[in-house]
Design a protein with these regions (language model features):
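Concave beta-strand-loop units of leucine-rich repeat
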Residues: 4-8, 12-36, 41-170
Length: 170
């Protein structure tokens, strides 16, 4: 597998790692070494869909200076993943759909982040986790379809005029 010298985006799905939407590398799994190599690039976007990424595999990305858009969908992340994102000064979009073990208790780690959009669809997010999300000062949109958030939980965040929770009737 030949890696390019530079990359701005990385996307892994179905065993294929795509760098900058054009360089395709066969990668049936994402190893710790691959994650370290990817974290070495000046990426602005990183997305993985359908691979059991763990909190530990994310650690090389801690403090990534240019990351704007980060997504792990249908992975194996927990609330312990949030400190990794807390030191990404340009992070605006955090997509964590389908990580069932995320409850929201780790969200206070993002208190100083500039995240505009947080997607937590199909996670274990509950009312307490939603309150943690609502306390993030720069968060404007949160998606929470197919979570444990109740109507009462939504009402508890109603006083926060800045945040716009998005949930569809289920």
């Amino acid at each position: 597998m030949e890696w390019p010298k530079r990359a701005r985006t990385a996307d892994w799905e179905n065993g294929v790692l795509t760098l900058d939407t054009e360089k395709r590398l066969e990668a049936p799994e994402l190893t710790a070494e691959m994650m370290e190599r990817l974290a070495g690039y000046a990426l602005v976007g990183f997305h993985v869909k359908g691979y059991p990424i763990t909190d530990e595999l994310l650690s090389p990305f801690a403090g990534h200076k240019r990351m704007v858009n980060f997504g792990v969908e249908d992975g194996a992340l927990t609330d312990a993943c949030f400190p990794v994102f807390s030191h990404m000064p340009k992070l605006r979009y955090l997509l964590l759909d389908g990580n069932a073990d995320i409850r929201g208790s780790g969200l206070p780690a993002l208190q100083n982040c500039k995240i505009d959009l947080l997607t937590l669809n199909r996670t274990g997010l509950d009312d307490a986790g939603l309150l943690c999300a609502a306390s993030l000062p720069r968060l404007f949109h949160i998606q929470l379809d197919h979570t444990s958030v109740t109507y009462e939980g939504l009402l508890a965040t109603a006083g926060n005029a800045r945040i716009e929770p998005v949930a569809h009737v289920q």
